[in-house]
Regions:
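N-terminal single-pass transmembrane signal-anchor helix
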Residues: 1-22
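N-terminal export/assembly leader peptides and their processing motifs that target proteins to secretory
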Residues: 22-192
Length: 192
């Protein structure tokens, strides 16, 4: 009797493959990320807080009335009709400097008002330090100026000149009744 031997060749199982996939992204200080979004949220809250505090204390109204009617510009403005080297020399300017000045945050302040025909709006710069970045935040507050509102001198004191009595104030009288104009003060802030 013959015996037959059968040999079976088993193949070894294939080794598992491991693939590594890498994705690289450069992150700069101004890249959108969770931390930069957090910084923007803080700047937004700070801008809103400055405006709210200034409105509550009356400093915001005093700041929009801090107008040199003979020079047709804000008092002590460094260039043109507005400030370029720092905030206005008043309580609102002090608040802006406290909140933004020491943190490396640049800001512009604009005052938007109704134009003479009552339908269009115009914008007066109060503080302008440059073009905002793409990550700039904006906050605004409206100040309703009455016909009885009085311009402020360079020390912040009342001049005795009502806005309704001068033609040299940047915003014209467009409302009927006791309201002179509604001024929207906007702070635009960004990290430098």
């Amino acid at each position: 009797m013959a015996t037959t031997a059968s040999v079976s060749h088993a193949t070894a199982p294939a080794a598992p493959s491991v693939i590594f996939a890498l994705q690289m992204t450069s992150v700069t200080p101004l890249s959108a990320s969770t931390s930069s979004q957090h910084v923007e949220n803080q700047q937004q809250a700070a801008a809103e807080g400055v405006l709210a505090g200034a409105a509550d204390s009356g400093a915001l109204e005093r700041a929009v009335l801090f107008w040199n009617e003979t020079g047709e510009r804000f008092h002590n403005a460094t260039e043109g009709r507005y400030y370029t080297r720092g905030p206005p020399d008043n309580d609102f300017g002090d608040a802006l400097d406290r909140v933004f000045g020491t943190r490396g945050i640049a800001y512009n302040v604009y005052v938007t008002y109704q134009a003479g025909d009552g339908s269009a709006t115009r914008r007066q710069r109060m503080v302008y330090v440059g073009e905002p970045s793409d990550n700039a935040v904006r906050a605004s507050r409206t100040v309703v100026v009455s016909n009885e509102a009085v311009l402020r001198d360079s020390d912040g004191n009342r001049t005795g000149t009502r806005v309704a009595e001068t033609s040299d104030f940047y915003a014209p009288d467009v409302a009927s009744g006791s309201v002179y104009n509604s001024l929207r003060v906007e702070v635009v802030a960004w990290r430098i």
